[in-house]
Swiss-Prot record:
InterPro entries linked to this entry: DNA_Rcmb_RecR, Rcmb_RecR, Rcmb_RecR_Znf, TOPRIM_dom, TOPRIM_RecR
Organism: Pseudoalteromonas atlantica (strain T6c / ATCC BAA-1087)
SMART domains for this protein: TOPRIM (SM00493)
Designated gene of the protein: recR
UniProt family annotation: Belongs to the RecR family.
Protein purpose: May play a role in DNA repair. It seems to be involved in an RecBC-independent recombinational process of DNA repair. It may act with RecF and RecO.
Domain of life from the UniProt record: Bacteria
The protein, known as: Recombination protein RecR
BP terms from Gene Ontology: DNA recombination; DNA repair
HAMAP family given in the database record: RecR (MF_00017)
Amino acid sequence: MKLSPLILELINAFKVLPGVGPKSAQRMAFHLLERNRSGALQLSQVLHNAMEHVGHCKQCRTFTESELCEICAHPRRSEAGTLCVVESPQDVVAIEQTAEFKGLYFVLMGHLSPIDGIGPSEIGLDELANLLDSKDLTEVILATNPTVEGEATAHYIGQMCSARDIQATRLAHGMPVGGELEYVDGNTLTHAFVGRRSLS
């Protein structure tokens, strides 16, 4: 059976989502057409509103509907003197859920990757430099992912901090809580040994 152009267009639209292949996209499209047209219309409206009204915070670059996000607008956050640098807005959400960090964030929207043509300007390091110069910071926490690119990005930002006499720290890596030693990969185990701390 040949699908109509509109159905094909709907299926292709779903394929822009991460992890959604042709079969999953087709299943989603057919589900909405068969069983949930009102839900589809609501999804369409909410999606349109989000694309129209959600932008980036002018200070930290996370998603917000205002000029400044709720965190950057909070006076106590600025007074903390700490900045946490992350790769994505999802990382901000994850850290906020711990309720451990009370400072400001800067969202890179990626990491350095010269092979892919992503250099310092593509991830906003000029904006980060301005933030480092304008804020009274005592510590910058580098919470980039523990990948080759994430480590390279952390190293680069660490040098930016060092040039300004700001302490740069890296999130600890190692054993997951509740994990069993035999299932931990060698790289993670190495990080766990290097980052071990005294109990006394």
